Amino acid sequence: MVQTKTLTYNSPIEGDVVVTRLDAAINWMRKNSLWPMPMGLACCAIELMASACARFDISRFGAEVMRFSPRQCDVMIVAGTVTYKMAYSVKRIYEQMPDPKWVISMGACASSGGMYRSYSVLQGIDQLIPVDVYVSGCPPRPEALLDALIKLQEKIDKEASLRRLKQSAA
């Protein structure tokens, strides 16, 4: 009878080192290649368009490719007033986006209803979908949107992306 010994290395950090490195690589790729989808619903959309001009250079943050198809984007920028009639469409578009997905609420109207406090206006998009970054202002300047992209990149950098991939695969 032949006995076989298996050599093992018992380390408290075994497995975590590789996962951490892979997480960092995945998060680096995600944060530097954001594909935003503009939901320009009011005057904030003009400032959103201005942020794509050469003066502000949104391409520095890897977000220059604006997609108008929810299946090809990972960041939704809700810019402007959201009415209850429009809310169903916004939620449906959000659900069509592939995971991982993030939302930027741009402007006072998208964040809190703004000056339109009426029966037909949703008082904040966060009542409908989860929001990751808020941009204040009426309308906010393009620099504020660029700052929101930086904040979103910092948030993406801290996520445990590989663990989330394993959970969604199970």
UniProtKB/Swiss-Prot annotation:
Cofactor requirements of the protein: [4Fe-4S] cluster
The keyword Membrane appears for this protein: yes
GO molecular function: 4 iron, 4 sulfur cluster binding; iron ion binding; NADH dehydrogenase (ubiquinone) activity; NADH:ubiquinone reductase (non-electrogenic) activity; quinone binding
Organism domain of life: Bacteria
GO BP, sorted A to Z: aerobic respiration; electron transport coupled proton transport
Topology term for the membrane: Peripheral membrane protein
Gene Ontology cellular-component annotations: plasma membrane; respiratory chain complex I
Enzyme Commission number(s) of this protein: 7.1.1.-
Catalytic reactions on record: a quinone + NADH + 5 H(+)(in) = a quinol + NAD(+) + 4 H(+)(out)
InterPro entries, sorted: NADH_UbQ_OxRdtase-like_20kDa (IPR006137), NADH_UQ_OxRdtase_20Kd_su (IPR006138)
Subcellular location: Cell inner membrane
Cofactor note: Binds 1 [4Fe-4S] cluster.
UniProt keyword terms in alphabetical order: 4Fe-4S, Cell inner membrane, Cell membrane, Iron, Iron-sulfur, Membrane, Metal-binding, NAD, Quinone, Translocase, Transport, Ubiquinone
Binding annotation for [4Fe-4S] cluster: 43-44, 109, 138
HAMAP family named among the record's database cross-references: NDH1_NuoB
Main function: NDH-1 shuttles electrons from NADH, via FMN and iron-sulfur (Fe-S) centers, to quinones in the respiratory chain. The immediate electron acceptor for the enzyme in this species is believed to be ubiquinone. Couples the redox reaction to proton translocation (for every two electrons transferred, four hydrogen ions are translocated across the cytoplasmic membrane), and thus conserves the redox energy in a proton gradient.
Family the entry assigns: Belongs to the complex I 20 kDa subunit family.
Protein name: NADH-quinone oxidoreductase subunit B
UniProt organism field: Methylacidiphilum infernorum (isolate V4)
Lineage, uppermost ranks: Bacteria, Pseudomonadati, Verrucomicrobiota, Methylacidiphilae, Methylacidiphilales
